[in-house]
UniProtKB/Swiss-Prot annotation:
Matches recorded under PANTHER family: 60S RIBOSOMAL PROTEIN L23A
Residues annotated as transmembrane: none
InterPro entries: Nucleotide-bd_a/b_plait_sf, Ribosomal_uL23-like, Ribosomal_uL23/eL15/eS24_sf, Ribosomal_uL23_CS
Function: One of the early assembly proteins it binds 23S rRNA. One of the proteins that surrounds the polypeptide exit tunnel on the outside of the ribosome. Forms the main docking site for trigger factor binding to the ribosome.
One GO BP: translation
Source species, domain of life: Bacteria
Alphabetic keyword roster: Ribonucleoprotein, Ribosomal protein, RNA-binding, rRNA-binding
Entry GO MF terms: rRNA binding; structural constituent of ribosome
Family according to the record: Belongs to the universal ribosomal protein uL23 family.
Protein name: Large ribosomal subunit protein uL23
C-alpha cells in the first residue's frame, strides 16, 4: 500500500489538552490528534521540525466512534487518530507548556 505524502502541518491536527494529558507531560509525553493517514515516522518528523525537539518514541491509538443520542436521533462521533509522543531527556515543547 503506497503511503500518501503529507506536509508537516497536515500531520498534526491539534494538541489534546485534558487532565490525563497534562499529567503525562511530567513524563515528557505530549498527546496530539493526528491525521488518520499519518504513520509514526511522519508524526515523529513533524513534531521534531515544528517544535524543534528530539522525539524518543511515538505511540499511536486509533479512536473508535462512540454512539451518541440527541433526543430520538441516534448517531456516532467520528473516528480519529491519537498520538502520544515521548520526547528525549531534557526537551519540552514550550509552546504547549503555557496552555494550562
Amino acid at each position: 500500500m503506497k503511503q500518501e505524502k503529507l506536509s508537516l502541518h497536515d500531520v498534526l491536527v491539534r494538541p489534546i489538552i485534558t487532565e490525563k494529558a497534562l499529567r503525562l507531560r511530567e513524563q515528557r509525553k505530549y498527546v496530539f490528534e493526528v491525521n488518520p493517514l499519518a504513520n509514526k515516522n511522519q508524526i515523529k518528523e513533524a513534531v521534531e521540525k515544528i517544535f524543534n525537539v528530539k522525539v524518543d518514541k511515538v505511540n499511536v491509538i486509533n479512536m473508535k466512534p462512540k454512539p451518541k443520542r440527541r433526543g430520538i436521533f441516534e448517531g456516532r462521533t467520528r473516528s480519529w487518530k491519537k498520538a502520544v509522543v515521548t520526547l528525549k531527556e531534557g526537551y519540552t515543547i514550550k509552546e504547549l507548556e503555557g496552555e494550562h
